């Protein structure tokens, strides 16, 4: 079962929740990065938050290059989850706590995402662990949300360790269990690390990555 219908519905509900509760669209700090998502004027030199809406991509994002580089087949949901929209990361409440789902802000962001997924998969190979790929963060960024590449199930994972808790048998069922979390935008501070340039959620991945490197 594709995760796309569940993702479509969640993104629609996400913006409707902000409009119903706050009377405005969700806002995001793009840190100078343009996007088709941005509503209204955009000044690349400004550090102000922007209002945004998800935008369907005209040309779908593909992970065929990642599959070719690593000589493996990725679970098909990765193309639906990351390749259908340009959007900001989205916040959620769930039976397992609060968290954030990663999305792709622009084409350069998609390229950076692919680099990070390659890095994550190479780390799993180095540790001789089954392949997973990340979709977001749980509990203030202390835990990653990952998809088991063998069967598409969703798990809690701490970098360097095996996935610890299965949350849902599929990405679609996981997304269906989420509800939008309404919160003001947060301006994330970037840590200096090559090839990890995504504003926001990648800052949390960087912190976890530094914690992992410190253990090795």
Curated annotation (Swiss-Prot):
Cellular location of this protein?
Answer: Cell inner membrane
Q: Which residues form a coiled coil?
A: none
Q: Which InterPro entries match?
A: Syd, Syd_sf
Q: Which UniProt keywords apply?
A: Cell inner membrane, Cell membrane, Membrane
Q: Where is this chain primarily localised?
A: membrane
Q: How does it sit in the membrane?
A: Peripheral membrane protein
- Provide one Gene Ontology cellular component: cytoplasmic side of plasma membrane
Explain the purpose of this protein: Interacts with the SecY protein in vivo. May bind preferentially to an uncomplexed state of SecY, thus functioning either as a chelating agent for excess SecY in the cell or as a regulatory factor that negatively controls the translocase function.
Family (UniProt)? Belongs to the Syd family.
Q: Which HAMAP family match?
A: Syd (MF_01104)
| Official protein name in the record | Protein Syd
Source taxonomy: Bacteria, Pseudomonadati, Pseudomonadota, Gammaproteobacteria, Alteromonadales
Which gene name does the record give? Answer: syd
